[in-house]
Amino acid sequence: MTGIEIDGKVVANEILQRVAVDVDALKQDGWAPTLVSIRIGDNSAVDRYVRNQQRNVSKVGIDFVEKYFPPDISEAEVHAAIVNLNVDPRITGIILQRPIPENLPIKHLQATIHPLKDVEGMHPTSIGNIVYRELELGPCTAIAAVELLRGTGLSIEGRSEEHTSELQSRTK
């Protein structure tokens, strides 16, 4: 059996093109999307990830703001910063970069981000929506996997064990 080659860069570029059109429409209506990246402490992998985020959002016209906090920041201070971003109408998306220092409760801080501003889809509400097949605000990794599968042209609706042979025959 041979596999299907999936070119993630092609899929990513298609997504970026669609997002750019949506962002342009929002800007024409007077609404400029802004993503805030919260980074706590120093981590070279996170630094690289943030640079890639900044590059990609600039490609589609989204404003990018990085909020850096020292590793010894308190939970209360991070919580307050997130709450302030939640109520700021200029901020349309928030992402909490991981890993964060071990003394901070990632689950609690992630749950502090309002579900409508939770870019990663890690708020408990967003994760719960998966059960109801509401992926509009789902976890970004899961949505990326679905987009990659869609890029193959294979039908992914209603797949179960009884459909496995059809899927296997199309991938040979």
Summary of predicted features, one role per range:
Residues 47-60, 170:
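Short, solvent-exposed amphipathic alpha-helices that sit
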Residues 162-172:
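Single conserved hydrophobic/aromatic residue that forms the stacking wall/gate
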